[in-house]
Amino acid sequence: MWTARLSSIAVLTQVVGTWADTITLNWEITWVNAAPDGFHRPVIGVNGKWPCPPIHATVGDTVVINMKNSLGNQTTGLHFHGINQLDTNYMDGASMVNSCPVVPGSSMTYSFTADEPGTYWYHSHNMAQYPDGLRGPLIIHDDNDPFDGEFDNEVILTISDWYHQQTLTLVQNMLVSSNDQWRPPLPDGMIVNEGGNTDIELDIGTTTRVRILNFGALTAFMLRFGSRDMDVIMTDASYVQRETIHQLRIAPGQRYDVLVSATKKDKGKNIPYLISMDLNRDFTVSGTWTFNQTGYLITDAKAPCTAKEVVQQWRPFDEALFTPLDEMPLLGPLDRTWTLNFALCKDMNNIPRMCFNDQTYVMQKTPTLYTAATVGNANTDPSVYGAVLPFIIEYGDVLEIVINNLDPAIHPFHLHGHQFQVVERPESGSGSFDGSSTANPVPPRRDVISINGGSYARLRITADNPGVFLFHCHIEWHVEMGLTATLIEAPEMLDGYDIPQAMIDSCKAQGYPVAGNAAGDTINVWDDSGYLTDPPSTYSGSQWPVPKGGNSQKSRPRRKPSGQSSQTRQISNMSGEFQHRITW
């Protein structure tokens, strides 16, 4: 069980009359052999160890990570999930969006301010690496925590699906024309605390804050702490009014902070709690459901841990019904509406993809932020960004994002750079938004929301964070299928945006443009002839051991064949691809 222990070099600086630390971490990203569920496989670790270490900071601290890529055969990078990166958009870590990936043998420094408290996590946002292990908790503590004094200690509880094969093989097997059911890789099991200790020490008469994170690539999880209630105090790093519930559903990417207590009646007992993988239509359920795990709330270290927790029916609390602690009212009036219709699709090679508005995200040659920073006033024109499904809003705009889920399954969607208000999220089968629904006057805020099958969700933000931010499904396999769009926020304030020279040099070293439109054209930024529009027919990535010769060939997005239209040919009324690199 992770504890709130800070392992770093801390330098004190005075900020606005208070003391803040600079948390400096030196990380070497390496392959490590691990067996969290008893099956040995290569995983991506830090400084020769796995699980990857937690990061602990306090509001106002500066977090600095000096990262060296020693994988030998794969580019990498770090994204800090839930951190809004105000004024540091280039640190968001999404490959070819905010920066270029970091090649083997080279280094990159990430630096950002821990400006908002909460439970976050970091992970690779490059080539589906985080299911291979590159992920860890990021906790920002609050000296002014409104729940201070209501708990005695805290622990971290991570949950994840787990695969015995490496990501490269899984994605290669998924992106084939014979996969006509759009079947994602199915996990071989689940792990809690990355295969570590699942027990939570809970002394009689005390309350523990449990920080729950779902690191999964595909599945949501159900959680119940035995016969006792849990009090939710935070959702996705947003304080909420204390809500007493019995069961919780945690989607991929989501986090919950809950309080769990032990009373005198628990003396001498070790109380079982149950985590179960959410039943999903992609699974063939056998007679015995094996994807669950029992942990214990330990009130007596000498007492046996033999009792089992049985749940007859999962009925979790609705994640869209929490009330923000500050009771911030619904944003409005609206300035813009961004409607995204999500559905399954296929590309011109009959390979299964996923589409917003009949289009799939295609990674471009120039990082999208670099385009916004270098094309002048043209950065307000969506056409200069290529096939990244761009949507542009001005500073101060109130934006409503409407996502119509045309698929019968539940999908978790995540927005970088913001905590959005969940205006409305109807039950499954409600159909697409018809404009007639009412809004929650005091909506909860979070950065991942599960959208029910055959239904929709409405989300609102104020454009107060200039930058380039992805909006995507947080099922990692669906990101690889292309279920991503791009928010270009306040481009009028991004012209000439100052990007660290080290990041520019990293792009140049790989042959990527650092200025101009999506193709790197600085002369005629409206010339789309060099844009990438085709989904690659092969997927290249990493697999251990490192091939002979050390570093793999430099991977580059595929060029559009000469004379081909800038729009991908549609099959089944769909098109496109996402961020798969090919070797040429």
UniProtKB/Swiss-Prot annotation:
Q: Which residues form the Plastocyanin-like domain?
A: 29-144, 154-277, 364-491
**Gene inactivation effect:** Does not affect the production of scytalone.
List its EC numbers: 1.-.-.-
Q: Where in the cell is it found?
A: Secreted; Cell surface
UniProt GO MF annotations: copper ion binding; ferroxidase activity
Q: List ligand-binding residues for Cu cation 2.
A: H81, H123, H474
Binding, Cu cation 3: H125, H416, H472
Pathway, per Swiss-Prot/TrEMBL?
Answer: Pigment biosynthesis; melanin biosynthesis
Q: Tell me which Gene Ontology terms the entry assigns under biological process.
A: cellular response to iron ion starvation; melanin biosynthetic process; reductive iron assimilation
Entry binding sites for Cu cation 1: H79, H414
User: What Gene Ontology cellular component terms go with this record?
Assistant: cell surface; extracellular region; high-affinity iron permease complex
Per UniProt, the keywords (alphabetical) are:
Copper, Melanin biosynthesis, Metal-binding, Oxidoreductase, Repeat, Secreted, Signal
UniProt biased composition (Polar residues):
429-440, 562-576
Expression triggers? Expression is positively regulazed by the cluster-specific transcription factor pfmaF.
For the region Disordered, give the residue spans: 426-445, 536-584
Coiled-coil annotation reads none
Renumbered to this chain, the signal peptide range is: 1-20
**Where is Cu cation 4 bound in this sequence?**
H411, C473, H478
Q: What is stated as this protein's family in its record? A: Belongs to the multicopper oxidase family.
User: According to its UniProt entry, what is the function of this protein?
Assistant: Multicopper oxidase; part of the gene cluster that mediates the biosynthesis of dihydroxynaphthalene (DHN)-melanin, a bluish-green pigment forming a dark layer in the conidial wall that protects the conidia from UV radiations. The first step of the pathway is the production of the pentaketide 1,3,6,8-tetrahydroxynaphthalene (1,3,6,8-THN or T4HN) by the polyketide synthase PfmaE though condensation of acetyl-CoA with malonyl-CoA. T4HN is not stable and easily oxidizes into the stable form flaviolin. T4HN is also substrate of the hydroxynaphthalene reductase PfmaG to yield scytalone.
- Identify this protein by name: Multicopper oxidase PfmaD
Its source organism is Pestalotiopsis fici (strain W106-1 / CGMCC3.15140)
